[in-house]
Amino acid sequence: MLGYHLKKNVKPIVKHPFFAFIVFGLVLILLQILSWTAGFPKSSAMSGIATVLIYSIVGFGFTYLLGYAGLASLGTAGFTGLGAYIVGYFLRETGVPYIVSILVVLAVSIILGVAVGFISLRIEGIFLAIVTLGLSEILYQIFTNWIDFTGGPNGSSASIPIFQKWLGLSTTTSKRAMFIVLVVVVVFLMIITFNLCKSSTGRAMLAMKNSTSAAQAMGISLLRYRLLAFVLSTVYAGIGGIMFMSYLGYASPTNWTLMFSLNLLAAVIIGGTRSLWGTIVG
């Protein structure tokens, strides 16, 4: 009888999509703990996993933009780099709390998303991709030439926040702890993305992707959902930039070229434009 009730209560939990996300996060945290205490996996392997997770955060933004809204963007490199440089500048040059720099990145990302969203109402397809590419190239030139802000071609560095400053941990130990923060952020964003995509918001975006005329006939606002798709995409890119600088502690203009955007786009397409797991694997 006990086994029956246990199975009855546990089975729905195991089948819930969030369960897989949480288990995924716990496995990664366990790997970090093993690397920390037993030396296996090696720290280089954990850094590789962290890089994949950072790219995945940015890729999740494509789930909304390309997978559901059917909108193309090649501006991801610029948006991600801007997030990295902003948080790096605040950590390096100012005494403001880390959370303030995060809020600034999110605010700038929202503004960029709204701006590009309005542009998407006028142009679509390859023309929209070209416009976002142009915006990314403008940002790239800023990254290269605004030396006081970005360090110019030599790039900029910033000490890893939170643990190093608040708890007095060494750089190596702080980086390991930051990996756990990164995993928590990834799992949280997976849950948020899954919820939004399965909600009425996701269905409205999908209808807009399939036919803008039919979507408008059903009362779906193109303005609202295109703006939302781009805002979510740029916010995720900004968060990816935050994690990039916070974990790696260094960024240079060469990180934010067209190849960054193309590699991400390829990863999302190969893995599946509406698949979170596919984005990570891709």
Give residue spans per PLM region:
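Transmembrane alpha-helices and adjacent helix-loop boundaries
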Residues: 1-282
